[in-house]
UniProtKB/Swiss-Prot annotation:
Superkingdom: Eukaryota
PANTHER family named among the record's database cross-references: SERINE/THREONINE-PROTEIN KINASE FRAY2 (PTHR48014), STE20-RELATED KINASE ADAPTER PROTEIN ALPHA (PTHR48014:SF20)
InterPro entries: Kinase-like_dom_sf (IPR011009), Prot_kinase_dom (IPR000719), STRAD_A/B-like (IPR047173)
Biological classification of the source: Eukaryota, Metazoa, Chordata, Craniata, Vertebrata
DNA-binding recorded as keyword: no
Domain notes: The protein kinase domain is predicted to be catalytically inactive.
Subunit structure of this chain's protein: Component of a trimeric complex composed of STK11/LKB1, STRAD (STRADA or STRADB) and CAB39/MO25 (CAB39/MO25alpha or CAB39L/MO25beta): the complex tethers STK11/LKB1 in the cytoplasm and stimulates its catalytic activity.
Record GO biological process: activation of protein kinase activity; protein export from nucleus
Pfam families xref list: Pkinase
Protein name: STE20-related kinase adapter protein alpha
Gene Ontology annotations for the cellular component aspect, listed alphabetically: cytoplasm; nucleus; serine/threonine protein kinase complex
């Protein structure tokens, strides 16, 4: 992964492709002038940030410099330009895993593609946990895929150190800041906010939720009020993979799309309008069967008792990953077809700041502001 010069003049800002961080962050596609490479530039208005926000950002930058792993998205450059903090990363041409399920795999991805994606994320998590941190924001939008099929975990902003005064703490109690978008992925013990606290096993629960998200095409507990979601999780409601083993046979005869699915909680699915226009009755999108290994993997991740969840290193040896025979960079581009990475851009920035002609059509599908690099 490239490193870049920490000088604003080295970057030609092309178009705004996202916003974030309480609308104080602008995400630009940019061209790195020395090489012509396309990059993502995250610009944060420091003058508008509160002291708490600045401290939060300092923690993120500290973590980014501390971590070095093939599956963690590195920051190519960080520097101050005028009143802005600039964070430069390589452009992820496949976008995030969430982008893929939102635009191409709306009823879920193939099991093998999910295995490659989760393996990359777990390798990153294993490293983060060994470094004494909890990620606290594992979800599909924070799993990015480069043009050559490599998997990167992002979202370092939410990482929390479990080391205090030189000693590793057994648990921590801090609730993630600015975490409203990540609530469906958070474990019961994080949401509970009690004296028992939580540890790195809370990330494993999030891996299980992310597995369901990738397989079902939507995150469990989707659109559920926060209070109800908390009650469901504390009462032991366990999401699952939607397939022939978890959906009643009579419901599989209905033509149902993910828009009618109810959060992957293995309850009744209401019928929706058939997808074909020629009068044929299409098959149910969840009329498929995931392997017992995949089901067991998810069940292990979503154990209510965090002590019963395997560690990231243990999960990497799970039978679910035995189906992987090649490197992700070799296999993922094939498994993601017909999706092709965004590698070419036409035109230049217009005077009315509307962006690059011909580019927005491609980029508008990417929820870049949710990548949180």
């Amino acid at each position: 992964m490239s490193s870049f010069l920490p000088e604003g003049g080295c970057y030609e800002l092309l178009t705004v492709i996202g916003k974030g961080f309480e609308d104080l962050m602008t995400v630009n596609l940019a061209r790195y002038k020395p090489t012509g490479e396309y990059v993502t530039v995250r610009r944060i208005n420091l003058e508008a940030c509160s002291n708490e926000m600045v401290t939060f950002l300092q923690g993120e930058l500290h973590v980014s410099k501390l971590f070095s792993h093939p599956n963690i998205l590195p920051y190519g450059a960080t520097f101050i330009a005028d009143n802005e903090l600039w964070v430069v990363t390589s452009f992820m041409a496949y976008g995030s895993a969430k982008d893929l399920i939102c635009t191409h795999f709306m009823d879920g991805m193939s099991e093998l593609a999910i295995a490659y994606i989760l393996q990359g994320a777990l390798k990153a998590l294993d490293y983060i946990h060994h470094m004494g941190y909890v990620h606290r924001s594992v979800k599909a939008s924070h799993v990015l895929i480069s043009a050559d099929g490599k998997v990167y975990l992002s979202g370092l902003r939410s990482n929390l150190s479990m080391i205090s005064h030189g000693q590793r703490q057994r648990v921590v109690h801090d609730f993630p800041k600015y975490s409203i978008k990540v609530l469906p992925w958070l474990s019961p013990e994080v949401l509970q906010q009690n004296l028992q606290g939580y540890d790195a096993k809370s990330d494993i629960y999030s891996v299980g939720i992310t597995a369901c998200e990738l397989a079902n095409g939507h995150v469990p507990f989707k659109d559920m009020p926060a209070t109800q979601m908390l009650l469901e999780k504390l009462n032991g409601t366990v999401p699952c993979l939607l397939d022939t083993s978890t959906i009643p046979a009579e419901e599989l005869t209905m033509s149902t799309s993910r828009s009618a699915a109810n959060s992957g909680l293995s309850e009744s699915l209401a019928p929706s309008t058939p997808r074909t226009s020629n009068g044929d009755s299409p098959s149910h999108p969840y009329h498929r069967t995931f392997s017992p290994h995949f089901h067991h993997f998810v069940e292990q991740c979503l154990q209510r008792n965090p002590d019963m969840r395997p560690s990231a290193s243990t999960l990497l040896n799970h039978s679910f990953f035995k189906q992987i025979k090649r490197r992700a960079s070799e296999a993922l581009p094939e498994l993601l077809r017909p999706v092709t990475p965004i590698t070419t851009f036409e035109g230049r920035q217009s005077q009315d700041h509307s962006g690059i002609f011909g580019l927005v059509t491609n980029l508008e599908e990417l929820e870049v502001d949710d990548w949180e690099f």
